[in-house]
Regions:
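Nucleotide phosphate-binding/pyrophosphate-handling subdomain across enzymes
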Residues: 16-33
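Active-site-proximal beta-alpha core segment in soluble small-molecule metabolic enzymes
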Residues: 4, 9-12, 29-138
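Short, basic/glycine-rich phosphate-binding loops at helix/coil junctions
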Residues: 1
Length: 138
């Protein structure tokens, strides 16, 4: 066999994904253990991975972009318990706040401008708005 006749095969052990989540969850005890499903679950397919994590008790999920949040919400729409979807790279375009609020997406705010926009939106509608804030100050 030469290099031109070889190919790669990737086998994904879905039971190992479930087992790894259970193990990580056991390490954090009563803290939240979230699943990170960005980039279509790192190429494994959000429609296959999200239900596995959900069935293991995962209710908090991080995605990279809003379109991934929509896809995740659709995949898990038939499940009974509420899920929390955190979006790492929000669009931050005019009107994004209404969209996130309507779909119950939780933004990960990466700069003070986004923090102020989200805070102002909450004041406008008289609600406290959930968010994760990651600010790196130099």
């Amino acid at each position: 066999m030469n290099a031109f006749n070889t190919y790669s095969v990737l086998n994904i052990d879905l039971d190992a994904i479930a087992s790894n989540y259970r193990y990580l969850r056991s390490l954090v005890n009563s803290s939240i253990c979230a699943g990170v499903l960005k980039a279509d679950s790192y190429g494994l397919g959000i429609e296959g991975i999200a239900p596995i994590l959900y069935n293991e008790g995962c209710r908090h999920f991080f995605v990279a972009y809003t379109n991934e949040a929509v896809a995740l919400k659709n995949v898990l729409s038939t499940f009974q318990q509420k899920i929390h979807i955190y979006v790492l790279n929000g669009p931050y375009l005019k009107g994004w706040e209404d969209y996130y609020h309507h779909h119950q997406f939780i933004p990960v705010l990466n700069d003070l401008e986004a923090v102020h926009e989200w805070q102002s939106y909450g004041k406008e509608i008289s609600q406290k708005m959930p968010a994760v804030c990651i600010l790196t100050l130099a």
